[in-house]
Amino acid sequence: MKKIEIELNERSYPIHLGTMECLEHAGAVLVVTNPKVGGLYLSYVLERIRAREVFVCTTPDGEAYKTLESVEMILESAFNHRLDRKSLMIALGGGVIGDMVGFASGIFQRGIGFVQIPTTLLSQVDASVGGKTGVNNAFGKNLIGLFHQPKAVYIDPLFLKSLPPREFGAGVAEMVKMAVTFDREFFEELERGDLRDHSFLLKGIERCVKIKARVVAMDEREQGIRAALNYGHTFGHVIEHESGYGHYLHGEAVGMGMVMANTLACGLGLLKESEAERIEKLLARYEIPTRYAIGDVERFYDLFFLDKKSENQKIKFILPEGIGGVAFRDDLSKSMVLSVLEAFCD
């Protein structure tokens, strides 16, 4: 099992890559999962936990359930099982479970430890690393949450064997995102290789985790360079909101958002048309949707202002500057942005 360290001083923690080894904890443990993942892997994980007591909480599956109500369900389970400040929560699932358990553990008795065991490609390469937690509400995605770093992350490739093609593609979109913003050489490797090849996939996961680890160590609270990892998300979050949470997987929405961001970047001279075509071609190879039909451009534009990166009523766009670079722009006129959105009207 390989280990990558997230360097955050007293909050540093390891990311373990490989077959999951024994997880030991002196106090009580609450494992939170959903029916689908639990049915496949709960027994596998429970066999590897050594703790005073181990309890299980099962929440509904899907982005539509990433809500305060679901977090309350987790908290009620923690109280019913008499967890205390020495207890540990474990998130066994994809990004939805990880976000909710991270949030619940961060507010339970003012904060207890938690461990991420991500079971989707998206959560293994991105969502499980870095301490972002939160839930959605009527106004938008992840607008209620906090930064709460896990104690450890266990990335076991076994979990990917049962991953449906759409979930796989959603994870690939996040891998492409990291390559475009931080690593041109990695992007070119993704163009040449095939992530459906297991050994190539494992190398890609490790590459993404190292990128994320480096960025988080530099900017834990997303005050600067970490915001680059939101490439595709400014547009993608609006797509998720407008289409209804769960209609598109998060990674699918990010993929479509990347294409929109690329169009804007091309208009500004930051990205060549040929580079935008290469990015879209790579996404399409894994059957990731790349085009979203916007119904109302004014409404779509207004929803940008709910984005967490927006400040002083200015929309901050994360745009590729070539392949391997990134630019932050908050000075774009409404007319310029609308002209891009109109290119995606149905």
From Swiss-Prot:
Pfam families: DHQ_synthase (PF01761), DHQS_C (PF24621)
Coiled-coil portions: none
Keywords assigned by UniProt, alphabetized: Amino-acid biosynthesis, Aromatic amino acid biosynthesis, Cobalt, Cytoplasm, Lyase, Metal-binding, NAD, Nucleotide-binding, Zinc
Molecular-function GO terms, alphabetical: 3-dehydroquinate synthase activity; metal ion binding; nucleotide binding
InterPro entries xrefs: Dehydroquinate_synthase, DHQ_synth_AroB, DHQ_synth_fam, DHQS/DOIS_N, DHQS_C
Gene3D superfamilies per UniProt: 3.40.50.1970, Dehydroquinate synthase-like - alpha domain (1.20.1090.10)
Needed co-factor(s): NAD(+); Co(2+); Zn(2+)
Localization per Swiss-Prot or TrEMBL: Cytoplasm
Any GO CC annotation of this UniProt entry: cytoplasm
Reactions accelerated catalytically: 7-phospho-2-dehydro-3-deoxy-D-arabino-heptonate = 3-dehydroquinate + phosphate
Cofactor binding summary note: Binds 1 divalent metal cation per subunit. Can use either Co(2+) or Zn(2+).
Keyword Chloroplast on entry: no
CDD domains named in the record: DHQS (cd08195)
Positions annotated to bind Zn(2+): E174, H233, H250
PANTHER family, per database record: 3-DEHYDROQUINATE SYNTHASE, 3-DEHYDROQUINATE SYNTHASE, CHLOROPLASTIC
Function: Catalyzes the conversion of 3-deoxy-D-arabino-heptulosonate 7-phosphate (DAHP) to dehydroquinate (DHQ).
Protein name: 3-dehydroquinate synthase
Lineage of source species: Bacteria, Pseudomonadati, Campylobacterota, Epsilonproteobacteria, Campylobacterales
